[in-house]
């Protein structure tokens, strides 16, 4: 092969690698509850690349389906803040109700469902008009919030009432109240919308609810040698898109449980930072990021090997986490 051909081939390979890296580039946005900031991590470099200020006590964070905006629950500011995803600049606040903690954007990007912990309601905001279209009475201390992929139901979990409240997304009416174990924190639907997973922090379980019968069909429990039951506290969860594997944050147990979604058996416990709270995949599900509130860091986990790759220092009390694609 001639020298010019070699150079051309090398240049093509470099260009291809650059395109691939760009296509797979993501940034991890982490809300720091005590610092009132967002830390942004380069998902390839696994390093914080910038930090910026937001409202008071930021917790829930998510991106719009089109990735043009991101939303932050500034709980002590009683606001959901809207930012430009390209510049990280604050745009405006949405009328969120008191103490917004978690929220979920409808799959069509039109509505935002917000759990208001202090006044026991779910607030629904039209994202185009920026107006409240409904406030729905739910149980005491609502926290978890999810919307089914088919956009038929929203669910709010109430920590003190110990229920998952199913809400019809067209009528904004509660259509069922499903009892679960003590202090339900987080909810996730399977990709086919047939099952709802709810984590119970104090109960130490994850309930799997059949959406057809609206009853708890099975439960997952956890057993970690050397740890007492009271420190094993399921909170944030993520389910793979193929509905084969669940990753469950276990709070002060400092571990993420990896669960086979068919057998509901724990395949592995991954040791991470202290008081692991919420989780987020990269879009291709190759990496999983965990927020560790007490150790003030984020753990990056290789999903293929189920091993932690790096611990990344962020702000104080990291809480929520969301992924942004870089165009």
Where do the protein language model's features map onto the residues?
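Predominantly soluble domains enriched in secretory-pathway, periplasmic, or organellar proteins
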Residues: 4, 12-327
């Amino acid at each position: 092969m001639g020298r010019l051909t070699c150079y051309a081939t090398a240049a093509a390979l470099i260009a291809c690698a650059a395109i691939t890296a760009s296509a797979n580039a993501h940034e991890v946005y982490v809300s720091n509850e005590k610092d009132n900031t967002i830390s942004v991590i380069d998902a390839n470099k696994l390093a914080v690349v910038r930090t910026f200020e937001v409202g008071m006590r930021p917790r829930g964070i998510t991106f719009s389906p089109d990735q043009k905006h991101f939303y932050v629950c500034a709980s002590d500011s009683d606001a959901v803040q809207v930012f430009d995803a390209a510049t990280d600049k604050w745009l405006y606040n949405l009328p969120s109700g008191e103490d917004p903690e978690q929220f979920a954007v409808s799959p069509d990007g039109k509505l935002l469902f917000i759990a208001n912990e202090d006044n026991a309601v779910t607030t629904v905001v039209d994202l185009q008009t920026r107006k409240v279209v409904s406030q729905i009475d739910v149980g005491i201390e609502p926290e978890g919030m999810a919307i089914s992929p088919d956009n038929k139901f929203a669910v709010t979990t109430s920590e003190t009432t110990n229920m998952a409240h199913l809400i019809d997304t067209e009528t904004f009416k509660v259509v069922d109240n499903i009892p679960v174990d003590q202090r339900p924190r987080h909810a996730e639907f399977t990709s086919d919308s047939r099952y709802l997973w709810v984590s119970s922090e104090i109960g130490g379980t994850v309930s799997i609810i059949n959406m057809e019968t609206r009853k708890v069909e099975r439960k997952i429990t956890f057993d970690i040698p050397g740890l007492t039951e009271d420190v094993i506290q399921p909170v944030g969860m993520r389910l793979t898109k193929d509905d084969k594997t669940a990753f469950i944050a276990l709070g002060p147990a400092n571990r993420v449980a990896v669960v086979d979604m068919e057998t509901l058996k724990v395949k592995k416990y991954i040791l991470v930072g202290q008081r692991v709270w919420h989780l987020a995949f990269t879009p291709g599900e190759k990496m999983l990021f965990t927020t560790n509130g007490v150790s003030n860091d984020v753990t990056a986990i290789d999903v293929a090997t189920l091993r932690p790759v790096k611990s990344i220092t962020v702000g104080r009390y990291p809480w929520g986490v969301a992924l942004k694609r870089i165009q």
